[in-house]
Swiss-Prot record:
Positions annotated to bind ATP: 11, 59, 87, 93, 104, 114
Gene (UniProt): ndk
Enzyme nomenclature, EC number: 2.7.4.6
Record organism: Rhodovulum sulfidophilum
Reaction equations catalysed: a 2'-deoxyribonucleoside 5'-diphosphate + ATP = a 2'-deoxyribonucleoside 5'-triphosphate + ADP; a ribonucleoside 5'-diphosphate + ATP = a ribonucleoside 5'-triphosphate + ADP
Primary location class: cytoplasm
One Pfam family here: NDK
Name this protein carries in UniProt: Nucleoside diphosphate kinase
GO molecular function: ATP binding; metal ion binding; nucleoside diphosphate kinase activity
Amino acid sequence: MAIQRTFSIIKPDATKRNLTGAINAKLEAAGLRIVAQKRIHLSKAQAAVFYAVHKERPFYDELCEFMASEPIVVQVLEGEDAIAKNREVMGATNPAEAAEGTIRKEFALSIGENSVHGSDAEDTAKEEIAYFFSGLELVG
C-alpha cells in the first residue's frame, strides 16, 4: 500500500466535550500522522458548501446547523492506506453498529452527532483538504 493523505473532522459534539486529544490519540495509535490541524467555527453557509453533496437528502439542513453550532477541528491525516485506516478507526456511521474500540462506538452520541467525519475516497479527500487548507499548511 502507498502512503496517502485523508481529511478528517472532529465534529461539534466531540469538541464541545473536549475529546480532541482522545480522538487524536486513537488516530495516532492507528498509525496515522496529523500533518495539518486547525480549530475553526464554520458558518452555516460554509457548512452548506462543504456538504453540498447531501443537498437533496432529508438530513441536510440539520447537518449544516449542527456543523455550524460549535467549533470543529479539521485535519489532514497521512499514513499507509490512510483513507481506509481512518474509516476503520472511526467506525460505522451509526454508533450502535460501530465496532468496539472505534471512535464512534466510544464517543458518538447518536447517528447525527457521531463525533467525526472522514473522506471516503482519494478524490473526495483531495477536494475536502483543499476546501480547508492551503498547500503551505500541509507539513510532513
